[in-house]
């Protein structure tokens, strides 16, 4: 029996020059929302980001070292038993967007596999990330499984 494809790790992608991957400090809610807006993704109230980050296992950010702008982001949550979830995957549109997405995915998955090796991993991601997810072994909606969300008001 061959190992599941998402458990195999692809080669580590290189970040383009002048970008830095970091876990600390956490980006501000304002910076995360600015990134999400640039990606055409929905934003959240700035004050809710500190709560979301405090309830996350960790977050990974990519910062442009030239102007210290947040250009990539992803965060992880888990029940620490069976399930891990990756949220808010975003990378600034432009020539480096795919490289930034691939770096975030690679490092997030490597960390989850190391820290929570038995967990199933799900991800909420924009359509532009599909190719990178497939390279990491993800299968789009395997067996017809569909994720659903409910926005609470």
Role assignments for model-derived ranges:
Residues 112-125:
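Conserved GNAT acetyl-CoA-binding A-motif
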Residues 129-133:
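Short, charged/polar "capping" segments at the starts of alpha-helices
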Residues 135, 148-152:
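C-terminal binding/interaction regions
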Residues 135-144:
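Conserved acetyl-CoA-binding loop of GNAT-fold acetyltransferases
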């Amino acid at each position: 029996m061959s190992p599941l494809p998402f458990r195999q790790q692809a080669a580590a992608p290189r970040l383009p020059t002048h970008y830095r991957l970091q876990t600390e400090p956490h980006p501000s809610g304002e910076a995360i929302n600015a990134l999400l807006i640039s990606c055409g993704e929905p934003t959240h109230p700035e004050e809710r980001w500190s709560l979301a980050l405090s309830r996350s296992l960790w977050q990974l950010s990519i910062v442009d070292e030239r102007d210290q702008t947040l250009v990539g982001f992803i965060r992880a949550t888990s029940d620490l038993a069976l399930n891990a979830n990756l949220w808010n995957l975003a990378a600034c549109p432009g020539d480096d967007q795919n490289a930034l997405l691939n770096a975030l995915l690679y490092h997030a998955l490597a960390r989850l596999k190391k820290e929570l090796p038995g967990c199933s991993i799900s991800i909420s991601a924009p359509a532009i990330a599909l190719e990178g997810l497939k390279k990491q072994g993800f299968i789009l909606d395997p067996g017809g499984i569909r994720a659903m969300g409910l926005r609470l008001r």
